[in-house]
Regions:
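Aspartic protease catalytic domain
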Residues: 2-37, 44, 74-76, 85-87, ...
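Signature of the N-terminal lobe/flap region of pepsin-like aspartyl proteases
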Residues: 60-69, 73-190, 322, 336, ...
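Acidic glycine-/aspartate-rich tracts in secreted/extracellular proteins
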Residues: 108-110, 201, 249-251, 305
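Charged, amphipathic alpha-helical segments
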Residues: 143-147, 207-213, 312-325
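C-terminal reverse transcriptase regions that engage the nucleic-acid substrate
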Residues: 196
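Extended, H/D-rich, highly charged conserved domains that either
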Residues: 199, 219-232, 236-246
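Flexible, small-/acidic-enriched active-site or ligand-binding loops
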Residues: 238-287
Length: 407
């Protein structure tokens, strides 16, 4: 066997071997969120949040049936890597159950937009990888234009086709090349693009979502993916997070899954039958809709409900944040969320963050106000704060979400 045959054999083993458990995995890494990045550089996040909520409201008033992706990416902390093209071009993407489209910045991104300029890296230390079709031998032109309204801004571009590799699975995929990218939040993000894990009905570009492409090709053990976020960044034998395609990993949870059927076709929405402090049900006595969203970090809810919850806890609202003296954080009570009669409980160590660099002895609660108007809202969003505590299984075949206590 000559050297080229040896190289080919080694390459095939690395890229096409099938794991013994039949599952494919995407390692997730933790990053500095946009919120943290702005705080470090003394930028005014409060004004951004006011503009962001105003933007959602304006869209709903323009068209009551307008579809808006409600994920607030400014607090997103986890990303994974995907490869596009031949040879591969690597991108950091947020895997988002709140949307269904897949896009990355294009090398043809309009320099009139600040987020497309390389000079952005000098001020915010953010460098975005851009897809260059001319460097890929497997690229195919599509050219269809698309526009996606996120709660935090709008991206625009055109569709292209190329080989995409995710979690060891390679396939031909249509995706978006973004040429219009707003500075807030995407220009300041540590990630490059978004890979939606929502249902096909959520796709605003009209393309077949990545997960559905995998299903159609029969490469998954089950029509399921599961999400793990490490609860302890110092836990060296586990990654910061992982998405398991085709099933679940028993090393990431204890006990069994409790399943909740989705409440709205085409959405990862479930009915929440109560929010309680200790055993006292304070909110959602008559049911609320909750979205389990891997693209979000905090737990968000309608302003009136969130303020009632925080007031009961004795927590003060400062600007756009809920803060408490760190010395008092351990005294905060448990908060429970009820699904189909079962309580999923967070204690204070699950929902309070301490900034070790802060000099004011104030800790941040990972709750936030978010008023989403009809027809999508009102809506609660359960982000990483919840998923870190409960390993989450998204079951497309049975249209349900399962929760198990994470390790």
């Amino acid at each position: 066997m000559n050297c080229w045959e040896l190289l080919l054999a080694a390459w095939s083993t690395c890229f096409f071997s099938v794991p013994s458990d039949g599952l494919q995995r995407i390692v997730l890494k933790k990053m500095t969120s946009i919120q943290e990045n702005m705080k470090i550089r003394g930028k005014d996040l409060e004004n951004f949040n006011m503009d962001w909520n105003s933007y959602v409201k304006q869209l709903s008033e323009l068209n009551e049936t307008a579809t808006v992706v409600v994920t607030n990416f400014e607090d997103t902390q986890y990303y994974g890597e995907v490869n596009i093209g031949s040879p591969p071009q690597t991108f950091r993407v947020v895997f988002d159950t709140g949307s269904a489209d897949f896009w990355v910045p294009s090398s043809r991104c309009d320099p009139l937009y600040t987020a497309c300029r390389k000079i952005l890296a000098l001020e915010y230390q953010v460098i975005h990888n851009q897809y260059d079709f001319s460097k890929s031998s497997t690229y195919k032109d599509n050219g269809t234009k698309f526009s996606i309204h996120y709660a935090s801004g709008r991206v625009k571009g055109f569709l292209s086709q190329d080989t995409v590799t995710i979690g060891g699975i390679s396939m031909t995929q249509v995706f978006g090349e973004v040429t219009v990218l707003p500075l807030m939040p995407f220009g300041l993000a540590r990630f490059d693009g978004i890979l939606g894990l929502g249902y096909p009905a959520r796709s605003m570009s009209g393309i077949l979502p990545v997960f559905d492409n995998m299903i159609s090709q029969g490469v998954l053990k089950e029509e399921v993916f599961s999400v793990y976020y490490s609860r302890n960044s110092m836990n060296s034998h586990l990654p910061s997070g992982e998405i398991v395609l085709g099933g679940t990993d028993p090393d990431y949870y204890r006990g069994t899954f409790h399943y909740v059927n989705t409440s709205r076709p085409g959405f990862w929405h479930i009915q929440m039958k109560g929010v309680a402090i200790k055993s006292n049900v304070l909110l959602c006595q008559d049911s609320c809709t909750a979205s389990v969203d891997t693209g979000a970090s905090f737990i968000t809810g309608p302003t009136s409900s969130m303020r009632k919850l925080m007031k009961t806890l004795g927590v003060k609202e400062e600007g756009d944040q809920y803060l408490i003296e760190c010395d008092l954080a351990p005294t905060l009570p448990d908060i429970s969320f009820y699904f189909d009669g079962k309580a999923f409980t967070l204690n204070s160590s699950d929902y309070v963050l301490q900034d070790m660099k802060s000099l004011d002895n104030l800790c941040l609660l990972t709750f936030d106000n978010l008023d989403i108007p009809p027809p999508t809202g009102p809506l609660w969003i359960l982000g990483a704060t919840f998923i870190r505590k409960f390993y989450t299984k998204f079951d497309r075949h049975n249209n349900r979400i399962g929760f198990a206590l994470a390790v």
